[in-house]
Amino acid sequence: MASTPRTPAPERSPPPVPTPPPPLEDEPPPYLADGSPREEASFSSDGREGAPPKNPQLSPTHHAAPRLVPPPSSPARQDGQEQEGSANKAAAATAEPAREPLRQMATGLARPLSSQTSPATTNSPTPSASPTPSSPAPVANNSKRSGQSTPKRAETKLPLSSPAVAVHFDPVEEAVTSPLRLGKARLDQQQQQQHAAGAAESGASVVPGVAAAVAAVAERRELLLALRLATAVLSLAAFSVIASARTSGWAGDYYARHLQYRYAVAVNVIVFAYSVAQSLGKIRHLVSPRFTFRTMSSYYCSLFLDQVLAYLLMSASSAAASRNDLWVSRFGTDAFVRKITGALWLSFVAFLVLALNAVISXANLFSMV
């Protein structure tokens, strides 16, 4: 199988080589514009003494990140970089300084962007970053104001609190001079004045509620005294007749032999003593004006005792009446049975009068309440 001949490559002209512009005669080389003292001593004004010509000035290299640092270069290249850096510094010094933007580093501190050197422009042979210049320590901000350039709104000054004053607390004085008590007394006084003004306009006398209740109780005091005395007299007559009832002879009888009669005598004695005590109290209220007012406990006690003694007197009279009826059904009627029957009638009447006393006591209690 025959081989196919290859087509020769087309002939191309070589790329043009750029030629640098000729340097001016009266302008010194750029790398000698602002050199180090050693370089100034080595070279003359025309730049032809003692050493070969330097490399032309190169533009600065910008890297994407500090970690992408090129490997260390040769000494000749390092010398060129030093000359390039010195030339850049001289050009920056001769040119008009421009305002550089400030970057906030800390509260109250600002540093220009030029102070932060990039690791790519340093002459260190290692890829480590160059140390930043030492910055002054931040000053303690005692005025509690921000380091920003924008002014803040003036702080409002709060008034100083007055010091606490210790006051002795007297519970008795507080109870007497309490605003609640003073306010209640003032309200009662205003109400009394309003009632008095209304009575003067209408021409009728207005009596406070407590005075009206006391007046109502006083009106029933004579009736209650009469009922107390009647109860005492009836109970006295009842237990006296029962105690005096007896017969002589072999068929004679006596009240102490029967439990029901003894129970009726005991209850009548208690009712008599209670009625006498209540009658003395009513007489004292009628005679002496100092004892016009009574406490609420006395009204409650009177109502309670009236009801309890009325129930006891009713039960005792009923028990004695049942025993007397049994005696009559067995042995007939005689003088002893007739006396017991009369005494039991007096005991029942005393019960009715004592029940009326209980009703009046309840009326007096609810009048005061």
From Swiss-Prot:
GO terms for cellular component: plasma membrane. Residues 1-222, 284-300, 361-369 are cytoplasmic. Residues 87-96, 114-127 have a biased composition (Low complexity). It comes from the Eukaryota. Residues 7-23 have a biased composition (Pro residues). Residues 36-51 have a biased composition (Basic and acidic residues). Residues 1-162 are annotated as: Disordered. Keywords: Cell membrane, Membrane, Transmembrane, Transmembrane helix. The chain crosses the membrane at residues 223-243, 263-283, 301-321, 340-360. It is a multi-pass membrane protein. Residues 244-262, 322-339 are extracellular. Coiled coil: none annotated. It is found in: Cell membrane. The keyword Cell membrane applies. Homodimer and heterodimers. Belongs to the Casparian strip membrane proteins (CASP) family. PANTHER family: CASP-LIKE PROTEIN 4A4, CASP-LIKE PROTEIN 4U1. This is CASP-like protein 4U1.
